[in-house]
C-alpha cells in the first residue's frame, strides 16, 4: 500500500515537472539535479570516443537527459520514440531541445548517432524499454525478456564507453544522479557473444539501480511485454 502511494506521488511529480520544463534554465537544472561524480564523465570524455549514456524511466528521466546536456560541453543527442499526436510531439521536442539536446527518432538516423560519437559527443537512451521479440534475451528481475542490443553494438563498434545514470528524487524534491561505468575492456570486437554479454551487464546494472528505489521506476507496466521464461537467458 505504501509502495503504491510513493509510486503515485513519484508519477505525479514527474508529470508536473514535464509541464514546468519550458520554464527551466541551465542554472535551475543544475540546482535541481546534483551529479555526484561528474569527474567520471569528464574522464571518459578525455578518451574522445564519445559516450553512450543510458538511463531508465526512473525518477525524472527527462531531467536526466537535460542534466547531462547542461553539465557537459559536448553535443548530446537522445533517441526517442515520436509521439502519435504530431502537435504533442512538436511541443515535447521543443521542450527537450531547449538547451541544445538533439532528438533522434528511434529506429532511424543511425548516421547521426555515429556522427555524434565520432565527434566526442554523448548519445542518451532510456535502457529499460521492452524490445522486439527477436532481440537478445537477458534476465531482468528474474524474468527472461528481450533487451535492446543497440547500445552494446554501438559501443563495441566505436569504442564509446557506456555509463548508466538515473535521477533519484530526494525528500526536498531535488535529485541526485551518480554515473556508473559499464565495463567492456575485456570484450574485444563485435560478436554475438560480446553483444549479449555487454547487454547483460548494462541490464543487470540498471536493475541494481532500480532495486535501490523501486517506487521511482515508472516502466514496470511495459517492460515484460515479451516474457520468455522458458528461454535460456544471460
What are these regions (language model features)?
Residues 1-55, 92-94:
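Membrane-anchoring hydrophobic helices of lipid-metabolizing enzymes
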Residues 28-33, 81, 98-104, 142, ...:
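Short, flexible loop segments at the rims of nucleotide/cofactor-binding pockets, characterized by
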Residues 1, 5, 43-45, 70, ...:
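Non-catalytic C-terminal accessory region of glycerolipid acyltransferases
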Amino acid at each position: 500500500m505504501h509502495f503504491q502511494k510513493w509510486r503515485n506521488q513519484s508519477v505525479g511529480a514527474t508529470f508536473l515537472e514535464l509541464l514546468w520544463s519550458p520554464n527551466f534554465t541551465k542554472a535551475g537544472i543544475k540546482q535541481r539535479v546534483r551529479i555526484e561524480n561528474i569527474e567520471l564523465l569528464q574522464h571518459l570524455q578525455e578518451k574522445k570516443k564519445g559516450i553512450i549514456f543510458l538511463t531508465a524511466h526512473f525518477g525524472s528521466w527527462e531531467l536526466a537527459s537535460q542534466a547531462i546536456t547542461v553539465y557537459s560541453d559536448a553535443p548530446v543527442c537522445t533517441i526517442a520514440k515520436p509521439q502519435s499526436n504530431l502537435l504533442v510531439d512538436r511541443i515535447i521536442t521543443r521542450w527537450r531541445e531547449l538547451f541544445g539536446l538533439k532528438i533522434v527518432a528511434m529506429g532511424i538516423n543511425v548516421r547521426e548517432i555515429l556522427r555524434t560519437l565520432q565527434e566526442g559527443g554523448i548519445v542518451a537512451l532510456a535502457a529499460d524499454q521492452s524490445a522486439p521479440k527477436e532481440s537478445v534475451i537477458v534476465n531482468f528481475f528474474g524474468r527472461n525478456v528481450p533487451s535492446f542490443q543497440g547500445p552494446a553494438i554501438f559501443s563495441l563498434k566505436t569504442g564509446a564507453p557506456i555509463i548508466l545514470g538515473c535521477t533519484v528524487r530526494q525528500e526536498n524534491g531535488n535529485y541526485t544522479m551518480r554515473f556508473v561505468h559499464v565495463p567492456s575492456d575485456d570484450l574485444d570486437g563485435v560478436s554475438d557473444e560480446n553483444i549479449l554479454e555487454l547487454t547483460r551487464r548494462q541490464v543487470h546494472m540498471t536493475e541494481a539501480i532500480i532495486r535501490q528505489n523501486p517506487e521511482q521506476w515508472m516502466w514496470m507496466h511495459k517492460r515484460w511485454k515479451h516474457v520468455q521464461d522458458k528461454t535460456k537467458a544471460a
